[in-house]
Amino acid sequence: MRNVLLIFLTVSLAVICCFSPGLAAEKAEPVRHIVIFKYSSDASEEQIQKVTDAFLSLRKKIPGITGFETGVNNSSLGKNYGFTHVYLMTFKDEAARDAYLPHPEHEKFRELLRNSPIFEESFVVDWVPHE
């Protein structure tokens, strides 16, 4: 009987630890960070590619970036309002995204955009993906 009680208490404690938010370690969730750029109408593909390459280089310079995809709008709906180039980053978790934002390499990239004659504007959306 004593062994049964000991097993019951052990299992109960394990269940409480696994399902109590205060006791169990919280699972780090990835964060998606989408940036969409509008370039000037006279921007050449070479100029845009230089900006894209500089942006892509951040994944090797800043820890916590686990994925980086780029693409060009190909929607036939005509509702992109001049925004054409999409950059989708995945961060390990919110802490990685929060460390990325003020990172010196990210600041250098932002300075490159501010000084670029082809960059017009961007917008950014971050989210934690759920099914």
Segments predicted by a language model, with ranges:
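N-terminal, post-signal-peptide region of Sec/Tat-exported proteins
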Residues: 45-86
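Bacterial N-terminal signal peptides
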Residues: 7-18
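An amphipathic, aromatic/His-enriched active-site/gating alpha helix that lines ligand/cofactor pockets
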Residues: 60-65, 81, 90-125
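Short, well-ordered beta-strand segments in beta-rich or mixed alpha/beta enzyme
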Residues: 30-39, 70, 74-101
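Glycine-rich beta-strand-turn "strand-cap" elements at beta-sheet edges
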Residues: 4-9, 25-28, 70-81, 111-131
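Extracytoplasmic/secreted envelope proteins and their assembly/folding machinery
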Residues: 32, 48, 52-55, 94, ...
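Sec/Tat signal peptide C-region and signal peptidase I cleavage site
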Residues: 20-24
